[in-house]
Amino acid sequence: MPTSTPFRPRSIAAVLAAVAVLVLPACGSGGQRGPTGEPSTHHAPHWDYDAEGPDHWADLDRDFLTCKSGHQQSPVDLPGHARLEPHEHTTVDYHSVPTVTLRNNGHTVQANLPTHNGNRIVVDDVPFELVQFHFHLPSEHTVDGVGTTMEVHFVHKSATGQVAVLGVLLRAAPGPSGFAPILSVAPRAVDVETVVPGPIDLRSMLPGATDQYRYQGSLTTPPCSEGVSWTVLGSPVAVAPADADRYRALFSHSNRPTQPLNGRSVTLAGG
């Protein structure tokens, strides 16, 4: 695995702030808070994937400057000829959860999980707990320039606040799909939440194959904070065409274009 760039104080603070915002609905907290949990006086501006889309994110707010100036941005085009390092495998330890809370946050459909839910990944011997997962359409990552129908990002946080994301590519195909219980009841109105009773087996959302791409990158939405450990599973998972259409009716497109690698290495592990 290539040596990663050390975390910069401002970068890790931005990552923590972004994760704090992501988990607010699950924690039941009110108001906007900064990385320390104190009320924040700075309110991030509106952004989207259209007029105020990826090409303009850095112009919307000082905290979004990394979206333009960063050198380890995500998503990326994953090379099919990536260096094979089977021992660099990210361990995925997923099980069922009793319930999830779905929220339409105006950018995607996000599923927030209860704390201490027992689902985690282990990256370089560091455990990361699953906090939430959300969707993009079409996929954000591509492989040799080819994308898929959708992509789901499972967002994890370590005990020290570092962030690791597991990306799963989704391809529309007939038949059963582990995403049906989520996408079939996604809230249509912004800022509306709905509780999905379980059990929900997260393993049904993963491919059977274990090949995975690993690289160092960033959040794919503002503030685009870097220092994020990425694992993208190489084999797509089926999503029912009707469920993809339901999501498309809410968000016709919700993907950031691929970003330059800028000399970063991509490792193919677990193959």
Q: Where do the model's predicted regions map?
A:
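Alpha-carbonic anhydrase
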Residues: 2-271
